[in-house]
């Protein structure tokens, strides 16, 4: 059914749909948007209702049957879908162009109110290759929803297919498992406040006009700046670093920026990820499953700014209770010489046995001689990193504590 013609405002609206870069007609692979449905409703107005209403029903029924949270993944979404389902960006291809496009696509869906979103890592259609899959695995480890997925006709592209990609996966997927407490906390804030998990830089730095045109870097929450390598054969990557102090999350090297581009040399096994000075996040130890990771002790990473304070938070629950879950909420603050962890809510029983392994403080300019709790396990003057071990004091995450050093 087609009711075409330049005068048909429903089939030929004054905008284009950028679908896989093809800018197809709005009715492509569907019935005419000028067609009338039951109730005298135009397809133009009703087309997107199918996906969102199916999402609502599927999510509701699954939760009623299991009496716990469901996880529904949908490609057909609409504003409001984010309260019910996750989204993936559709049938991409194993190309460098689609790797690049994945970043702004994911960021836009976060702004649409669909925070749990990701692209098919390594590409859905076509044959991926070692370099592309290595770069995509590193990048995809920081998607809100991370999944390597391709069609049945395409060659296998699991991380074990290429030894190099296996090494990349161990590093970056391993880091994702470490960051799950932080990512889960971002999911909590997305749920109750509407903040995207993956954010364009301009959202965190709205007065910095240099961030407005950045398409391929992104913030994971307010704390982590991800600078993907998106070009084939690249041996360096240039990213913009807003004013402040930024610490590499892998080797703790520091960038002090007034708001400028920085070029970093990269091997196949590198992707710059920096924690923002002034933020604090909680991490687990790496593991093979999220269930196993949740049973490991916490490390708390404190990134001190050049001057002033740092803060962060942690949200914990059982991951399954649907409404009014029993939760523990912890607030972290730090300044020069002091770190404080304050429990604001303490209803999740699982937090009672969750130990804090160590507190890592970045930006400590001189070696301290003593700490008020635990012991100094390391001070590295090159990275200005202080590590305070709490393993001997059996400090749990659900009780207040303060550490001072001098």
Map each language-model feature to its residues.
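Accessory, solvent-exposed terminal regions and/or long lumenal/extracellular loops of proteins
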Residues: 273-374, 385, 390-398, 405-406
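Solvent-exposed beta-strand/loop surfaces of large extracellular or lumenal domains
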Residues: 249-268, 370-391
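Intrinsic disorder/low-complexity detector
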Residues: 8-14, 20-21, 30, 169, ...
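Generic beta-strand structural signal
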Residues: 219-220, 241, 334, 379-381
